[in-house]
Amino acid sequence: MSEAEARPSNFIRQIIDEDLASGKHTSVHTRFPPEPNGYLHIGHAKSICLNFGIAQDYQGQCNLRFDDTNPVKEDVEFVESIKRDVEWLGFTWSGDVRYSSDYFDQLYQYAVELINKGLAYVDELTPEQMREYRGTLTAPGKNSPYRDRSVEENLALFEKMRAGGFAEGTACLRAKIDMASPFMVMRDPVLYRIKFAEHHQSGNKWCIYPMYDFTHCISDAIEGITHSLCTLEFQDNRRLYDWVLDNISIECHPRQYEFSRLNLEYSIMSKRKLNLLVTEKVVEGWDDPRMPTISGLRRRGYTAASIREFCRRIGVTKQDNNVEMMALESCIRDDLNENAPRAMAVLDPIKVVIENRAAGEEWLTMPNHPNNPDMGTRQVPFDSEIYIDRADFREEANKQYKRLVLGKEVRLRNAYVIKAERVEKDAEGHVTTLYCSYDAETLNKDPADGRKVKGVIHWVSVKHALPAEIRLYDRLFSVPNPAAAEDFLSTINPESLIIRQGFVEPSLADAVPEKTYQFEREGYFCADSHYSRPDALVFNRTVGLRDTWAAKVTN
């Protein structure tokens, strides 16, 4: 099924259909407004696919706007990574990239308008006093002693704030709404605070910065957004969104709609906790292949199509729910099973010497994909010495073991039938070398005498094999909901990364990052974008051929 054929249906699209049918809107204009204070993660991918997907399907527009109102936590590094992630996922924003800081002058004037209307005031309570005055969910707040300042005094004090006349934390601009409101967000929320920090876009022009709830709605209105889509934690904030727009002189009044955020098992989505993983060096960085960041998934070998498909499958609802990790893994398996070229790699090598074959290479033609001839073929060298995986040999085994057993036969993938004749061991009793014979008449065909050979194993030529570091990535956390733990770092999976030294076939010498292969019988792997070089290959496991996590947990 193509993505066009799989166009989703959800409550937001139903609202849009009704708005267009009624004439409330003649076109659709959405936006994706991340704060540039970290790398995007799989949860953001859901919002990206929703906002940009709606714009695509309705021939509308979607803006990329950076909510850059906190210069202390933001950085151009994050701006660039977010743009790269959106484009990599397959989307294009309308017009130029936008920044909330583009509207700082207008936002300031709207704040002045609220002061002139008696709807905003400069407060000089300390942060501790403000928390005390705010009240609780069961008790109303109380008015600040500065709440009833005159319009003239508030205008002068707000200008003093802008001019740098107050120290950080000693003054702020607050909306004058209702300190007894049952909704905490409506208890005179802060609209502006003081921060003496250089801004990555506006430099040192400002020392006062608007809060998200004040900036967000006005930015939407300035840009003509028709449907402002947020996650459920902003549901109560919709009251403030509407209050601000209702009380300033602006024609456009977008409507905010909320949907459930993505909660993915065995993962965390909190930027603070993700940052802790980086700063505590639990992971290598924001793009560590174990991280749920888009850059981490990309480095691990996930495709943009698989992430879009995942977002389509989980859908858009108003109900919070936890999505199983296997749902994401299923999407990448389905994609790579169909599209990834095949190759052979031996992760735990044991040497095989074929005694009845003369030394000398033979180049075998192998399909790049068993079910897709259009993907072509490759030449793989075969010789009298090969590596197989240690797990593919036993000296003794029952009938259920369909691999190589001493005295019995097995087929080499796309090659010959071999028989294990004898073994050589080291002083500790570990098998170091297998000595085998081969049937020269069985290249890609059954033995002439009709004997049955059921098992098939993969291999690489010793002479031609390329050494490679194989990084076996698994789930970063050992419990489904690490965020619920008292110390989420205590739930780190100690086997989330296992490094093996193996060998790969020579066709992988030029493997490029983000191109994923199926290592036959092992899983899906891609060259690491940071460390892999032609003379020092490093491959990351994207996902196994099947889900083995449940068995690990059970055992």
Swiss-Prot record:
Keywords: Aminoacyl-tRNA synthetase, ATP-binding, Cytoplasm, Ligase, Nucleotide-binding, Protein biosynthesis. It is found in: Cytoplasm. PANTHER family: GLUTAMATE--TRNA LIGASE, GLUTAMINE-TRNA LIGASE. Monomer. ATP binds at residues 35-37, 41-47, 231, 261-262, 269-271. A motif ('KMSKS' region) lies at residues 268-272. It holds the Pfam family tRNA-synt_1c. InterPro entries: aa-tRNA-synth_I_CS (IPR001412), Gln-tRNA-synth (IPR004514), Gln/Glu-tRNA_Ligase (IPR050132), Gln_tRNA_ligase_bac (IPR022861), Glu/Gln-tRNA-synth (IPR000924), Glu/Gln-tRNA-synth_Ib_cat-dom (IPR020058), Glu/Gln-tRNA-synth_Ib_codon-bd (IPR020059), Glu_tRNA_lig_a-bdl (IPR020061). L-glutamine binds at D67, Y212. HAMAP family: Gln_tRNA_synth. A motif ('HIGH' region) lies at residues 34-44. Its main location: cytoplasm. One of its GO terms (cellular component) is cytosol. Signal peptide: none annotated. Its EC number is 6.1.1.18. This is Glutamine--tRNA ligase. GO terms for biological process: glutaminyl-tRNA aminoacylation; glutamyl-tRNA aminoacylation. One of its GO terms (molecular function) is glutamine-tRNA ligase activity. It is an enzyme of class 6 (ligase). It catalyses: tRNA(Gln) + L-glutamine + ATP = L-glutaminyl-tRNA(Gln) + AMP + diphosphate. Belongs to the class-I aminoacyl-tRNA synthetase family. Gene3D superfamilies: Glutamyl-trna Synthetase, Domain 2, Glutamyl-tRNA Synthetase, Domain 3, HUPs, Ribosomal Protein L25, Chain P.
